[in-house]
């Protein structure tokens, strides 16, 4: 059994449902410390984070990831227990197999091989690992990034091990992500008997034209890296629970996935302008869970694309599609951030898995990336 496969199975067996780490990072420290990494555990509100660094020189290449996994869902629907790593039909099954314990194992083994082969490499290597990526993500990577920024540690490159590949290993690198901004809109009416609408004010009826306009609005055209900004309603709550009562208010939750062609302030102003145009009495609270980030084609993406081509023969594509990731925090302190990992077709699903044939090539790609940047 390859070392990467063995370590992947070790990590899957640790039932680290978010925000638990369940000893995953302790195992990583056991492996990294003998290589010369200075390992620091940073805890915050029940979340375990690891910052490990070998060397003090620039450039600093960081590998980032998360040890937490999403809940299993109904256990009786799994073909084999989710925290018992099981191989069958050329695949390794278990929660976290694709997202993202294989990536972490591959990164660590790649670093071990690289350090042993090139003890006098230039620059430094770092690991930023959290147990709070699948949850609120308020006490994980963002906490470590703030600590690194406060003490002036400069990151030059970062590879996040998210499962970015689509069909085969290496077909997609994420070089950015859209931002995410949510709004909670409360439209106020006047509650009353449904038979006497003239004595009430129905907020659902009132807000319908405004919602239709928001749905139809073209927020931007996107750009060469991003799809256009999208606006979607996620929840709508109104009514007193009776069929003969006009509600006093309606609450609408919505979300923007926005690209660099728009700004937070600009989107907010346009929403308020539409609501005001329709004469609504309303309250609107905003929350931003991430700003868009983008690493244009350059030394990091080129180094990884070359590593992928050398190992797999696949010509990779750069993409910014998908949801948010911890890359949004790292991009605030690191000029070049990309995400790369195994195929994502089974992530968060029952019977999550990775094809065994991809495991060692993934490790080799991470190692070749180190060689391209630090030799």
Swiss-Prot record:
GO terms for biological process: diaminopimelate biosynthetic process; L-arginine biosynthetic process; lysine biosynthetic process via diaminopimelate. Zn(2+) 1 binds at residues 66, 99, 162. Pfam families: M20_dimer, Peptidase_M20. The active site is at residues 68, 133. Coiled coil: none annotated. Homodimer. This is Succinyl-diaminopimelate desuccinylase. It comes from Herminiimonas arsenicoxydans.
């Amino acid at each position: 059994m390859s070392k990467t496969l063995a370590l992947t199975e070790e990590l899957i067996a640790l039932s680290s449902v978010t925000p638990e780490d369940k000893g995953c990072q302790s195992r990583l420290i056991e492996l990294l410390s003998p290589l010369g990494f200075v390992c620091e555990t940073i805890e915050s509100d029940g979340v375990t984070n690891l910052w490990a660094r070998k060397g003090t020189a620039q450039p600093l290449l960081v590998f980032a990831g998360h040890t937490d996994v999403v809940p299993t869902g109904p256990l009786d629907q799994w073909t084999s227990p989710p925290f018992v790593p099981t191989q069958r039909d050329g695949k390794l099954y278990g929660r976290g197999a694709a997202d993202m314990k294989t990536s972490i194992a591959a990164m660590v083994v790649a670093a071990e091989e690289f350090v042993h082969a090139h003890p006098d490499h230039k620059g430094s290597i770092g690991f930023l690992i959290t147990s709070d990526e699948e949850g609120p993500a308020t006490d994980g990577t963002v906490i470590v990034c703030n600590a690194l920024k406060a003490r002036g540690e400069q990151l030059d490159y970062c590879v996040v091990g998210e499962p970015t590949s689509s069909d085969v290993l290496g077909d997609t690198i994420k070089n950015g992500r859209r931002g995410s901004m949510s709004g909670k809109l409360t439209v106020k009416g006047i509650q009353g008997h449904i038979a006497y609408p003239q004595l009430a004010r129905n907020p659902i009826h009132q807000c319908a034209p405004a919602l239709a306009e928001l749905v139809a609005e073209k927020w931007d055209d996107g750009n060469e890296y991003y799809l256009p900004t999208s606006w979607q309603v996620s929840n709508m709550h109104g009514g007193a629970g009776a069929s003969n009562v006009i509600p006093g208010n309606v609450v609408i939750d919505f979300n923007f996935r926005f690209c660099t062609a728009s700004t937070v302030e600009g989107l907010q102003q346009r929403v308020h302008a539409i609501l005001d145009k329709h004469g609504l009495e309303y309250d609107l609270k905003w929350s931003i869970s991430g700003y868009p980030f983008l690493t244009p084609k350059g030394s990091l993406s080129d180094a990884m694309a070359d590593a992928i081509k050398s190992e797999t023969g696949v010509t990779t594509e750069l993409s910014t599609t998908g949801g948010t990731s911890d890359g949004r925090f790292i991009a605030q302190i690191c000029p070049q951030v990309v995400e790369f990992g195994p195929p994502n077709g089974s992530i968060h699903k029952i019977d999550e898995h990775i094809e065994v044939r991809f495991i060692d090539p993934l490790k080799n790609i991470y190692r070749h990336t180190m060689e391209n940047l630090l030799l």
